Amino acid sequence: MLTTLTLVSLCLVASTTQASDEWIDNWKSFAAETGLPEHAAWVAAIDNAEVRALAKDWADFRGYTASSLLAKETLPAELKPGFIITKDNIDSLPWVNDYLPQYWIDRLTSEWTPIKGIRIVPTTHYYMQRARLDATKELEPDHFKINEKGELRDKNGEHGFISEAGLPFINPKNGEELNWLFNAHGVGTDDLYFDTIDMAACNSENNLERIYKANIFWRRMAGRVSAPPLGNVEGFEGITEAGALLIKSPRDVRGLAGVRLRFADADKDDDFKLYIPSLRRTRALTGTNGQDPIAPGLELTWDEWRSNWFKTDRRKFKYTLIKEGIILAGPEVGNVYDPLRISDDACNLSGIVDMELRPTWLYEITDLTETYQYSVKRVHVDKETYYAQYLEMVDRNGDIWRIWDDTRDWEPTTGRFMWRSAVIANVRDERATIITVDSAWDKLDSMTNAIFNIDQLRDRR
């Protein structure tokens, strides 16, 4: 009897392991079929014991994977890896509007930022770092609450992002909880360094007007788990995160620098400073300046530099959970290749865009002040990354003004995230900012807190 039970147990373990690894097997088969070197390279990045172990630990904690959620859905027969949506077959696909954002549908038929097709790739199992998982496991289910100002507070009344490193509201029940889970993703790592980020200003004829090259830095100032200084950063008390930008070219704006420090207190505005080299002076900005473009000609504003980065305040914004669903979105394979395949001219996509099926929550952020440039932001939040898979920004007339869609540079062996590419499209005026990023993984250790002092940042130019 003992032998029989042992054999049954071993079979169950093997079955569970096999099921949890199926996403890797799917990628192996897919890469063999396409024969594309970038797909083979992605298989090499995920086909190892370290990835399997980390993916399994996150799956065990969540109680699901992207694949298990998709398995519960009745998906169209065509919607599987290898299928390519084109302008020739899209009209024969009655389901396409249920999964593919309108912006991408239009790319198949429009002369503005056109593409040849959208290839479905296998769904990947994403996760964050093990240390973030461990910190989250330590929390009690009711550890956090949201107060009357919309602040995240722990059970002792302290600011949640200051006192804890774990993720809040893993199973969000409403829009406010989902918004804080999204905020907790941050940038998916303790430190971020772009060297460089290229921001191309593109017109309606798909021509490049200007390209800005810059460094972007970001640092989690509290709840650090994976890179020194661990915990909270001395000298930045009350601050949850900091971002900095330094433009390197073109020459007329070289040296433009911005630093933004985010306080946990909803009543304390961001410490937001901008150095303007042509004037040789530093300006103190306010939260409303976050609506301004980062540089002339760009659709990218300070509030959208990581899809959505304005401050949470339930007195100014309403956060509403709309639905759960499935969306086609770019895979986070940027550590190996760019699934958008941005052309060398910086303003076009070179042909076939890769997308995968992702389970998401959709929530809306509604402006209550009637003074913000967007009346609503619609955010599709991934159920594994807890970050935006797609974002729509609605103008004061109720029409879509801009969309944000990006691809991440995700490191499978560690669960760390940075970025690879992004499109910020002004669908109203047919302009776009197309971004390519070189995530400087090898330079993270060189980052210091001095970067987040505007006087010292400007001297780096």
Locate the predicted segments by residue.
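Bacterial N-terminal signal peptides
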Residues: 3-13
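Sec/Tat signal peptide C-region and signal peptidase I cleavage site
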Residues: 13-19
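Solvent-exposed N-terminal domain segments of exported/luminal and surface proteins
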Residues: 21-269
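Extended beta-strand-rich segments in extracellular/periplasmic secretory proteins, especially
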Residues: 129, 134, 141-142, 150, ...
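Flexible, processing/modification-adjacent segments and terminal tails
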Residues: 161-202, 264-268, 276-358, 450-461
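Cysteine/selenocysteine-centered motifs that mediate thiol-based redox chemistry or coordinate metal-sulfur cofactors
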Residues: 321-327, 347-348, 415-461
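C-terminal soluble interaction/assembly domains
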Residues: 366-441
